[in-house]
Every structure is written in structure tokens, then in C-alpha cells.
């Protein structure tokens, strides 16, 4: 795509955010690996993001991410525009609706910050968010959860923005929600295809409509008790997860009535490595960057783990992390690796 077309569109839209070109995505993702993005946009605020989206050519690929804690960008990089919401859509406030206490959080707010804010307000139910290393937008997009609670368990409503810059407030009933799965239901009134889903896109993609914020409904609780729960959760996380090395959290979804980590460990794959990527000896569902890992190293480990577990146990693990972009050398790419191609959130 011709850069003059992009520049003209941005000038015409009158955007106020920051546009960066040819940015190494290892600087924006928690795996600290991968190729470069053709463009990265950091919006000034929600109206600015709307202006940016409206100004783009209709066929410009758009990816939205937060902290990049659930995302791998292949070594060949990614074409199009990557919108980084972390620390940008960062509104966080207490509201009340007919006696129900709500916390509004922008999509770029870190999940842990929401948990701390809720504790400060004497509200419970959001403690688990302290253990999710991503943003509100990413947690909404994948129904992130830990220790028995999932994001949509506490959602009252969400705010979204589409490629035309249109904002909507939607109730949970507009979505199909499951384990690490969120999809917008078909809008029967217009007879249109499921909003945000391109033909042949994965069924859990929200490609043309993204979360820009959410209202969480939380019960009253004692602030000290909430803080103690958060403290205990974080201690458990430190004890069980390899937080000392770059990683993207859980790589695979847990199969029904089982744990991905248990299956991987049962196959003797702890400390299995390719290049700088290794299955963590502390938690088998984590792949860590031991230093200098490429995206190809990480993706090769993912493929090898899936293949080995399938061969030895008969269980086919499903990926939880998102992989976007093109390989540095497509002819050498491990094509059997399953991946999501949508432009949804990356943590």
C-alpha cells in the first residue's frame, strides 16, 4: 500500500495521536521477540482513535493490542496498522447505576490496576484481575481468567468502537461467551454477518469492532479483605509462574476436565527447547524466552508441543496465544501450527 495514501488519510482525519513507522514488535510484546510493524498508532484518546480509524483506507489491515502479553509477531513482521491502547484509553472511575456500584475501565487499563482500584473503593470480585498480565481490552476479547473467575463474570456492559469510529454500548447478551472465547452474535435486525467477522475468519474473532472499555459490576466488600485476597493471589502466581523470563502467559487452553500443563509435563516436555525458546521448568504451559529467541523459535516449540501431546495422549491442544504476521522465511514455516489471523486484541 502506498504510504502517501496512508499519510493523506491521516492528515484528512486530523488525528492527534502518535504514528510510528517500522517499529520492532519485540519492544511492545511480553515475549520480547518478533518482527516489525509497518505502522504503530498510539491514540491520544477515544475520539482521536475514532478519527484515526475513519481516516484509514478501507483495506488497511488493523490490529489492536494492549500490553502484548498474549501476542507473538512473526519474524517477517506485520503489514498495516497496529493500534496500541495501553496507557492510552486509560479511564478508570467509580459509577453507580440504580444502587449498583460499577467501575468503568478503558480498554488500555492494565487488569491489575482495576483490581487495585476496586480494592481501594471497597469492592470485591475483581481480585483475580491482579493475576492477569494484560489490559482490559485483551481480557474482554478472550474472556481471560484465573483461579476460578473469568472476566465476563463481572461485566455489566461494554463499549466498542468500529472501523467507522462508531461507539456502541453493548450488554453481555450481545455476545457468545465461553472459556477463552468471545464472539459477537449476528445482528438479526440488519440481516448482516456477525459484526467483526470476516468470511473464513476464526469464529472468535472481533475483527472490525474492538472493545474500548467496560463497566464491571462489583459487590461491596471490606477493603482490607480484598487487599489480602490480592496479596495471596499474587504470591501464588509468583510461586507457580516463570515471571523472571519473558513469556506470554498460558500458551494453550486447558482441555475439558484436564490441564494443558499436566499433559505437557506428562510427555516429558519441560525444558524442551528450540533456539532461545524453552518450555518452562516451573510451569509447562509457559514458553519462555531464555535470551535471543526468535518468533520462529517460539512457534516451533508451540508446534512441537502440540504434535507430541497429540501423539502421546490423543489430546489436541488449542492455542490461547495469538500469532500474527509473516515468517521471515515462509518456505521454512511450520505450516501445521494453528494460529489466529484476526485483528483482535493482543493482551
From Swiss-Prot:
Swiss-Prot/TrEMBL catalytic activity: UDP-N-acetyl-alpha-D-muramate + NADP(+) = UDP-N-acetyl-3-O-(1-carboxyvinyl)-alpha-D-glucosamine + NADPH + H(+)
Stretches assigned to the FAD-binding PCMH-type domain: 33-221
Superkingdom, natural source: Bacteria
Organism: Nitrosospira multiformis (strain ATCC 25196 / NCIMB 11849 / C 71)
GO molecular function: FAD binding; UDP-N-acetylmuramate dehydrogenase activity
Enzyme class: oxidoreductase
Protein name (database record): UDP-N-acetylenolpyruvoylglucosamine reductase
Highest classification ranks of the organism: Bacteria, Pseudomonadati, Pseudomonadota, Betaproteobacteria, Nitrosomonadales
PROSITE patterns xref list: FAD_PCMH
Amino acid at each position: 500500500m502506498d504510504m502517501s495514501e496512508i499519510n493523506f488519510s491521516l492528515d484528512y482525519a486530523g488525528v492527534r495521536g502518535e504514528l510510528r513507522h517500522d517499529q520492532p514488535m519485540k519492544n511492545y510484546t511480553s515475549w520480547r521477540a518478533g518482527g516489525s510493524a509497518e505502522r504503530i498508532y498510539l491514540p491520544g484518546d477515544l475520539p482521536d482513535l475514532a478519527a484515526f480509524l475513519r481516516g484509514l483506507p478501507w483495506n488497511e489491515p488493523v490490529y489492536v493490542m494492549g500490553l502484548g502479553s498474549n501476542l507473538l509477531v512473526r519474524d517477517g513482521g506485520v503489514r498495516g496498522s497496529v493500534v496500541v491502547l495501553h496507557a492510552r484509553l486509560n479511564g478508570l472511575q467509580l459509577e453507580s447505576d440504580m444502587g449498583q456500584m460499577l467501575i468503568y475501565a478503558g480498554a488500555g487499563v492494565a487488569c491489575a490496576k482495576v483490581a487495585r482500584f476496586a480494592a481501594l473503593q471497597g469492592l470485591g470480585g475483581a481480585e483475580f484481575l491482579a493475576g492477569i498480565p494484560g489490559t482490559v481490552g485483551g481480557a474482554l476479547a478472550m474472556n481471560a481468567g484465573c483461579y476460578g473467575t473469568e472476566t465476563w463474570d463481572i461485566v455489566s456492559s461494554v463499549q466498542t468502537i468500529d472501523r467507522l469510529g462508531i461507539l456502541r454500548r453493548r450488554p453481555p447478551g450481545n455476545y457468545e461467551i465461553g472459556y477463552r472465547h468471545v464472539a459477537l452474535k449476528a445482528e438479526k435486525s440488519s440481516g448482516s454477518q456477525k459484526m467483526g467477522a470476516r468470511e473464513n475468519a476464526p469464529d472468535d474473532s472481533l475483527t472490525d469492532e474492538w472493545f474500548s472499555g467496560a463497566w464491571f459490576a462489583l459487590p461491596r466488600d471490606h477493603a482490607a479483605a480484598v487487599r489480602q485476597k490480592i496479596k495471596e493471589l499474587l504470591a501464588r502466581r509468583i510461586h507457580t509462574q516463570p515471571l523472571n523470563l519473558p513469556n506470554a502467559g498460558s500458551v494453550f487452553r486447558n482441555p475439558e476436565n484436564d490441564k494443558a500443563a499436566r499433559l505437557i509435563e506428562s510427555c516429558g516436555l519441560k525444558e524442551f527447547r528450540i533456539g532461545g525458546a524453552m518450555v518452562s521448568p516451573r510451569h509447562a504451559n509457559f514458553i519462555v524466552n531464555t535470551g535471543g529467541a526468535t518468533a520462529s523459535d517460539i512457534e516451533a516449540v508451540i508446534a512441537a508441543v502440540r504434535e507430541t501431546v497429540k501423539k502421546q495422549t490423543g489430546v489436541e491442544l488449542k492455542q490461547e496465544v495469538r500469532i500474527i504476521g509473516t515468517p521471515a522465511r515462509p518456505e521454512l514455516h511450520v505450516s501445521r501450527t494453528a494460529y489466529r489471523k484476526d485483528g483482535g486484541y493482543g493482551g
